[in-house]
Amino acid sequence: PHDLSIMTYNIQMLGIGEKDAPAKIVDYINNSGNDIVCMQEFPQREASFKKFPAYPYYHRHRDVAFISRYPIVNKGVINFDKGHSAACVYGDITIGKDTIRVYSIHLESYRLGKNEQQIYKELTSGNTQNATQGVKTISSRLVTANRNRAKQAQIIKNHMQQSPYPVIICGDFNDTPISFAYHTLSEGMKDCFIEKGRGLGNTYIGEFPSFRIDHILHTPTLGT
């Protein structure tokens, strides 16, 4: 078996809107030394892959992609119901005499915008006078997104169970390790952070509380 390094990264359209962010993100990935990089919120332009010359093999659907130093011998897309913002791609990658299947996923987000962020700020600062209706809106979106992610996770899990090769699944789950979606996808798998990580491992940075919502899971036979 070969050593393999893999990374998952929500690149937020290469940091669009921030002057130096695109170049910094590209340099970070190119210099990371990883064999495979799974990305979410990837620009939907074929030319974007040319920014990663060390990774000649790639696959993308919507805003989800992965790039690889090793050949992709088979690749596909998992489709979800119309109207869902989730996306998932997979590919079978040959490394020497071995083949693995890699999934790059981006499960549905809560779709909380600036208005919801402002409501959250008011709530956390103790200003609840104008936030009642906003709380109802946020609660509704949380419930809907959780239900949708649960369905999406089950569809992906069903596909994973048919894989003829060991599996690595990684990406932006938009959900924590105590969620139904994570539980569904991690059943029978190993979590790289649990195996090798330290601390809380928070991966979300934003207006809302930080959690570990990005994950890398793998078939136990692959080791960590």
Residue ranges and their predicted role:
Residues 151, 155-167, 173-224:
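Metal-dependent phosphoester-hydrolase catalytic domains
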Residues 7-14:
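Amphipathic alpha-helical repeat scaffolds
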Residues 2-7, 23-24:
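Alpha-helical transmembrane signal-anchor/signal-peptide segments
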Residues 6-7, 38, 169:
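Residue-level marker for buried hydrophobic side chains located in beta-strands
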Residues 117-140:
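A solvent-exposed, charged loop/short amphipathic helix patch at secondary-structure junctions
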Residues 1, 17-21, 30, 36-120, ...:
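Structured beta-strand-rich core segments of catalytic domains in phosphoester-bond hydrolases
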Residues 21, 25, 45, 145, ...:
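Stable alpha-helical elements in mature extracytoplasmic
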Residues 11, 42, 107, 172-173:
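Active-site metal-binding loops of divalent metal-dependent hydrolases
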